[in-house]
Amino acid sequence: MYGNWGRFLRVNLSTGEVKVEEYGEELAKKWLGSRGLAIYLLLKEMDPKADPLGPENKLIITPGPLTGTSAPTGGRYNVVTKSPQTGFITMANSGGYFGAELKFAGWDAIVVEGQSEKPVYIYIKDDHVEIRDASHLWGKVVSETEAAIKKEIGSNKLHIASIGPAGENLVKFAAIMNDGHRAAGRAGVGAVMGSKKLKAIAVEGSKRVPIADKQKFMLVVREKINKLRNDPVAGGGLPKYGTAVLVNIINENGLYPTRNFQTGVFEHAYEQSGEAMTAKYLIRNQPCYACPIGCGRVNKLPTLGVTEGPEYESIWALGANLGINDLASIIEANHQCDEFGLDTISTGGTLAAAMELYEKGYLTDDELGDAPPFRWGNTEVLHYYIEKIAYRKDLGDKLAEGSYRFAEMYGHPEFSMSVKKLELPAYDPRGAEGHGLGYATNNRGGCHIKNYMISPEILGYPYKMDPHDISDEKVKMLILFQDLSALIDAAGLCLFTTFGLGADDYRDMLNAALGWDFSTEDYLKIGERIWNAERLFNLKAGLDPAKDETLPKRFLEEPMPEGPNKGHVVRLKEMLPRYYKLRGWTEDGRIPREKAEELGIAEFL
């Protein structure tokens, strides 16, 4: 087999048993790897109704067949599990170097089962695997954990994925961090890791990923890298300004969510833009493994020193969504979240819900006491409550449940800007209605990455579409983006490659690496299979499409108050039935047997 090793580790933390399991190329041709392999294993082995924080839940850490190769952005890995935040499937994706190192060690996945009675970490050096005591690491922040493990093992070549105090304390939106500041961030994967008392996974590998046709692969890769470098976004805006290049673009288009999505225009957007960050604080770019784009930022602040980030989503979540414009405070807060192991989007979204509850009088000074008041623009709220959330102290214990549960405690869940209890990212769907349909139908909830309709609706990739068009063409484009994202994740590449590359380009790289002769349609069918399999998991876990596949009332009933999208709402009810029909599902959003048989997943019905 090429690309994949055809084997994965199964680590049972209840028994301490470590097993090597193998699989054949037939399985790889059906699921490709990574996100695909993971959902196959979860459906085959796990009850979707299992407690996300119980021993029955599985945590699967998995690179793809192109991870660790020279394919552009071939450093990605996925963390797939049942989310404690949503109760459904989640697939958190991260870059850096950890995923590539896991492939260099000779593994396609680590399947973590059970729960340890005491803190542990997993040490992997090629075929050597140990479960080690981590009692001395419990309580440490991410940078301290990485430094301590490298010192203990005696190697600076290690790449480490770990949780901070937020994961240890089962914060519903705790992240898994790797290589310092790279995050598998969303929907509480860090809490699942913490529930298993697994502090970290440290990996060192010395193998080379097997390639079917090395010369052809090298030529294909060179061609794709050139396409990316010649693209105005992948080769221009992202390398120059990072993902924060989007701040001004999204604000000018009137969908930069401000003050908990009350409007889509922020008067201080430029002050927190990529252009402003580059001028004030940037030291250098920080690319992930094999990445020709290099969107990562390394900044230096007088108060903090050198740190990585923040990305566009983090700038917005810890900035405009809270009415905060001070970029230095945002960078400091992002650093805090990375060290504690918190998802910045959900952290900011939860604090924004608290601010609106405070603004409307439902959260009062009597409850806050001496704590900073939840006023829009108050930077003290950031630094004070981020730590409180990570350690579940005082009001932080309630905030650690996420915005939906927090707002529900005060009788007003409508102030949670979330889908399936996962906080929405930095695009108001009233300014991109196809993107809004993507939020509603995303398998992991309020996510932008897996259905990035901002590309056609705002940025013009692969071509410009009217953001307020809700035709079948728009719905079909969303379905293509969802299936393609599943394929790219399963391959082990970054979704930013879609700026410059199309489905045929992924086909070329995969065929050269794996030695297959698949068509573009064959690969997109794998993506469709993965998307449907994840939905099947959710349906078995209790997904009620009529109740769960919607948007916050604000987007459906409250017209955008200002800017280019003034007067618009999301016409979800007009799009959703057509989405189900074009997916080949029933009118109530379920997968019929004939569709499951077409995709080869009927065994899981």
UniProtKB/Swiss-Prot annotation:
Its cofactor is [4Fe-4S] cluster; tungstopterin. Tungstopterin binds at residues 76, 93, 95, 182-183, 185-186, 338, 342-343, 444, 450, 489, 493, 495. It catalyses: an aldehyde + 2 oxidized [2Fe-2S]-[ferredoxin] + H2O = a carboxylate + 2 reduced [2Fe-2S]-[ferredoxin] + 3 H(+). One of its GO terms (molecular function) is metal ion binding. The keyword Metal-binding applies. It is an enzyme of class 1 (oxidoreductase). It comes from the Archaea. Binds 1 [4Fe-4S] cluster per subunit. Binds 1 tungstopterin cofactor per subunit. [4Fe-4S] cluster binds at residues 288, 291, 295, 494. Its EC number is 1.2.7.5. Belongs to the AOR/FOR family. Homodimer. This is Tungsten-containing aldehyde ferredoxin oxidoreductase. It comes from Thermococcus kodakarensis (strain ATCC BAA-918 / JCM 12380 / KOD1) (Pyrococcus kodakaraensis (strain KOD1)). The lineage of its organism: Archaea, Methanobacteriati, Methanobacteriota, Thermococci, Thermococcales. The gene is aor.
